[in-house]
Amino acid sequence: MNFTEDHLDVHEDMEDYLQSKIALLKSSKRKVINNKILKYLPNKFKDITFNHSNKKNTEQLELENLSSDDYIIKALPNNKFIMISKGFEMNFDTNKLMGEHNVLNIAAAFAAFRILNLTFTDYQNVVRSFRGLPHRIEWVREINNINFYNDSKATNVASTVAALEVFRSKNVFLIAGGDSKKLPLAPLKKYLTKNVAHLFLIGQDALKIQNFFKNLDMLKIFMCDDLANAVNEAFNLAKSGDIILEFNGTEIKEM
């Protein structure tokens, strides 16, 4: 289980959303939980946890605080990883799953495999062959060395941040809009000023998003009629090496 700001168009506030998550845990026999959200949960819900580490050396990890049901994953160069738990260490590699969020997904999947008593070979085969879900930072095509990605399943701010982190060294042309679900947009500001120079807006909350970000230096905002218009505008402005990232951060109901 993970927990980020979302669905505030349905829930009264984040506490109400959290309680709905806790209700799911109450009906679950086993629980795979992101270690970072344990502080929000009653102790009785601690079961199997996963997290990732950015520390340069595995020796710096606080292994003495781990139990055999705690898993920490660390990304290494060339799509290689190391999974560490108490009395356990495993090196493996994966296919080209992009982004820090997928590192966490890999750790969560491993914890689930352990619950099901599946073998490491089973796990390794799945991780190596899995290319990601459709519409989640899904590569679409490349034209003139401009790459198009479809991230239409990313319907909240946290998902947007995850995608922009993947392309933090690139110049991104971002297409967004739709229903913002009453989510706060402020966390996006620092990411939009890093590597997004052009923002193309469509959908019902396009004007709201434009008004929120219109004073950001260096950010050019374009109001577009629909997806086709936004893609064409972005492509006309993009240069070799740029990224056009379609639809993330909000829920597009106009599709």
Enumerate the predicted regions with their spans.
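ATP-dependent carboxylate-amine ligase
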Residues: 111-121, 125-135, 139-255
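Acidic, Mg2+-coordinating active-site environments of NTP-dependent enzymes
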Residues: 2-148, 210-213, 218-220
